[in-house]
Amino acid sequence: MRKRISAIIMTLFMVLASCSNQLEAEKLAAESKNTFFDSLVKIGQGFQDIFGIFGNAIGDALGFNAVKSDDKRSKVGEHFEGVGKGLKDTKIKLDELLKEVTAAPHADTTEVKSVINSASAVLTKLIDSVTKLAGAVGNTDIADGVSIANGAAAEEASVKTVIEGVKEIIDVATNSGVKIEKGNAGTAVANANGPKAIIHNAQAAAGDATKLADEVAKADPWAMIDKIKNAKTKNGIAAANDDAGQLATATNAANNNGTAATNADLAAAVALKAMAKGGKFTQPAANEDGAVKAAAASAVNKVLGILDVIIRKAVNLELGKIKEAVKGIKYSEATGEATESDTAQPITNKSSN
């Protein structure tokens, strides 16, 4: 009888011990899941902070109205510096997010870390490019030279740096998945319909500055940025069918020399001459200096505006890739490997590509 009672008591102890162990295991599992989901909340908040910082920074610096007709070229440099600061602040937040992801317990974050590192590399390249552009611009008036009869070529090294910076931004954005529009380049522009106002060796005739302003006003910004990306430079006088870089760096010539290959080339040349070091516009006819200044500011703003659009699209695409990767983070009770079906909740944002 005593043996039977002892067996029963032993069985009860074993059952109670088993129940206790099971309850403890369930408690630990629940705590692990709570810790996992708390980490996801922090990651989600950090992600939203990145969108906010980037949107505010680039939104404040949007370049379609970056310069006015009486501004110095240094204003262009300040714009690029502002964009660069926004990108740097975004990268800092991205690095902080990477730390949050790395520290997340009970989660397989390998893919997320890879995507964040890739996005960080894109930001670094964009920062380098806008820094290069900021250093390439001059510090004289946007429409420098309106009181001097002879136009002057923009510094070739400065123009080359601008071309390189623009090309780098476009290449980075293309690799991120941004569709770069070719735009409508328009047709060739005769010397008398605009080029004469920026390259010839004597004061422009009445109406020349207005014709230049009209050509710039109708230019497609996408086509302008494409022309800058593919531009060449020259050491010599302007010639027929010159591209944007050649017109900007051409030495002054007789009034009938130099035509633009397309409307977009002419407008892009105006932007390059107005941004780069050394470039001077030809003295306009009496009371037409305002038209040259307007053309210069408009051309620069079109280029800056499209560059900002391209940068914004590239960064938004990279952040979108992070968003999708974060949504796929899975819970793991033991090793951090994805062994359970619990996944992160979707992160919402208001950004667009």
Curated annotation (Swiss-Prot):
The record's InterPro entries line, in alphabetical order, gives: Borrelia_lipo
User: Lipidation sites of kind N-palmitoyl cysteine?
Assistant: 19
Q: What is this protein called?
A: Variable large protein 12
Gene behind the chain: vlp12
Source organism of the structure: Borrelia hermsii
Where found in the cell? Cell outer membrane
Q: Which Pfam families match?
A: Lipoprotein_2 (PF00921)
**SUPFAM superfamilies of this UniProt entry?**
Variable surface antigen VlsE
* Job of this protein: The Vlp and Vsp proteins are antigenically distinct proteins, only one vlp or vsp gene is transcriptionally active at any one time. Switching between these genes is a mechanism of host immune response evasion.
Q: Does the keyword Lipoprotein apply?
A: yes
Print the miscellaneous field: Genes for both Vlp and Vsp families are on (usually) unnamed linear plasmids in B.hermsii HS1.
Keywords, A to Z, come to: Cell outer membrane, Lipoprotein, Membrane, Palmitate, Plasmid, Signal
